[in-house]
Amino acid sequence: KGIDFDNDLTKVAKMYMVMIDDGHTGIWTSNALIPLGELTKNTRGTIMEEGADIIMTNPPFGSKGKVKDQNILSEYDFGFAWKKDKDTGEFEKGKLLAGKKGGGQVPDILFIERCLSLLKKGGRIGIVLPDGDLTNQNTEFVRAWLKDKAQIVAVGSLPQETFRPFGAGIK
């Protein structure tokens, strides 16, 4: 099962499923980051009722820009600014990132949260992310959030050439 924003890619995925005799249902064209209630009833029901044992994803990143839609950002913890308390070292949730010049959130960060929300308890995620999501100082809140919500079992690196045309280093 899967969701992709690109209609051509969903057609290719459905055709591939037919070729390997796996049917052609369970692939939908949609923005996977929109609030789950806005997905079609068929898509929403399948995803929300069953959950996923395994999620494999390569969310958009690199030069794709930020998500600035308040409707989308408000659905996510990562749609808000996070500030580290100097005394406690804990992160505090601040204002919605939309509306400010340069505001918004990169989609790969939002996809981390979306994937965890769709996963069954005990499920696993394989996700391709830019190096900085797990290493940059300005994404420390992401690591803190992940530490609280999930267990990172492994981080691997791919050769720099893998995504060079897209302008991003990856993990």
What spans do the regions from the language model cover?
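Phenylalanine-focused residue identity feature
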Residues: 5, 16, 61, 78-80, ...
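Flexible, glycine-/basic-rich loop-and-beta segments that form/coincide
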Residues: 66, 70, 164-171
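Intrinsically disordered, low-complexity regions
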Residues: 3, 38, 80, 100-103, ...
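Mobile active-site "lid"/loop adjacent to the S-adenosyl-L-methionine
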Residues: 61-110
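Conserved S-adenosyl-L-methionine
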Residues: 1-57, 62-66, 130-132, 141-142, ...
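A short acidic, often aromatic-flanked loop/helix-cap motif at beta-alpha or helix-coil junctions
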Residues: 33-35, 162-165
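Conserved Class I SAM-dependent methyltransferase catalytic core
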Residues: 91-163, 170
